[in-house]
From Swiss-Prot:
Gene that this polypeptide is encoded by: Slc16a13
Residue ranges annotated as Cytoplasmic topological domain: 1-10, 395-428
UniProt KW keywords: Cell membrane, Golgi apparatus, Membrane, Symport, Transmembrane, Transmembrane helix, Transport
Domain of life (superkingdom): Eukaryota
InterPro entries the UniProt entry points to: MFS, MFS_dom, MFS_MCT_13, MFS_trans_sf, Proton-linked_MCT
GO molecular function: symporter activity
Membrane-spanning parts: 11-31, 52-72, 81-101, 106-126, 139-159, 172-192, 221-241, 244-264, 283-303, 306-326, 338-358, 374-394
Protein name: Monocarboxylate transporter 13
General function of this protein: Proton-linked monocarboxylate transporter. May catalyze the transport of monocarboxylates across the plasma membrane.
Subcellular location: Golgi apparatus membrane; Cell membrane
Amino acid sequence: MVRRAEPPDGGWGWMVVLSAFFQSALVFGVLRSFGVFFVEFVAAFEEQAARVSWIASIGIAVQQFGSPIGSALSTKLGPRPVVMTGGILAALGMLLASFATSLTHLYLSIGLLSGSGWALTFTPTMACLSRYFSQRRSLAMGLALTGVGISSFAFAPLFQWLINNYAWRGALLLVSALSLHLMACGALLRPLSLTEDAAVGGPGAQITSLLRHGPFLRYTAALTLINTGFFIPYVHLVAHLQDLGWDPLPAAFLLSVAAVSDLVGRVASGWLGDAVPGPVARLLMLWTTLTGVSLALFPVAQASSTLVVLAVAYGFTSGALTPVAFSVLPELVGTGRIYCGMGLVQMIESIGGLLGAPLSGYLRDVTGNYTASFVVAGAFLLAGSGVLLTLPHFFSCISVSTSRPQDLVIEASDTKIPLPKEEGLGEN
């Protein structure tokens, strides 16, 4: 395979964008709409909210904690077979969940099996996309991740309609059929070889260098805090609205309102990330702060109009932070280490995904409402914003990628691994 000196910034990369669009829809669109099933599981198994919340949390955590496996396999085999295998596992998990007779079955089928499929699907696709773009990376990420917004808008009322007509078991069977389309997404991922790949060494050397890289560790800590509160509305907003007296279908529709705003936010932020001078991390900090504030204000709102405004605000800002979050990482670790870097980030931030929803459910069980749940979720995002302030060149007027001097080459396991001088190993 011929090595390219630079990412092509187009060409087949747009087909990778298309693949990532549908892949993100079929992974996080399903996860974000899972609050509709949450109410059904509580009623069907007569369990507390905290225990039912573990279904989505295990799925999110397994998807993220297993990401290094998907990354390592993609480094060896290429992303195509890995993603196609992930599609099979995701569909199989939903299929088995439709026959569940206890929460344990749902933990294993949706949480473990489908989560494993998502781990082999999401990270390799997004890492592959990062390698195809440089100057237009944020825009490409924004367009690809609009799949989450569009599917969240469509899936929440669709899933509620399916539940009303086929019960939750029949609805899960149809979600399984949808998940099989991840195989087609994987078939579109053509491997790309870059000259930087020859200099970064094997996966072991890459992981060792990343774990000693101060800016990478701080960025990972920030995303872990953000991830803890990020998914709370998509798990508990429907239940919160029903506590306020809303009917299930209008409550699910409010998730769709947030999803439309999310869609606009992803495209707008993707364009701004490439167009506005300065480090992309600064834009990420802005969107994260606004998302945290909107989350904390949800319990204050009582009127329907106010809740709609907050849903629009949360949808836009939470959608806007996603593409720039993926754009910051290649600036810190380089495209040659993007598979390992993205997999490692996803694994570590899975701690937040694992604890977020159960913590929210626990606070609901203790206090009797979701006020503390949303306030604490917002606080986690604001804490993540504070950590982002410590990244290199945050207060610079130029981007990280254009401010780097000549790379410093560091020996690790007899392999030369370049890292930027001002971001050297061991920096704290």
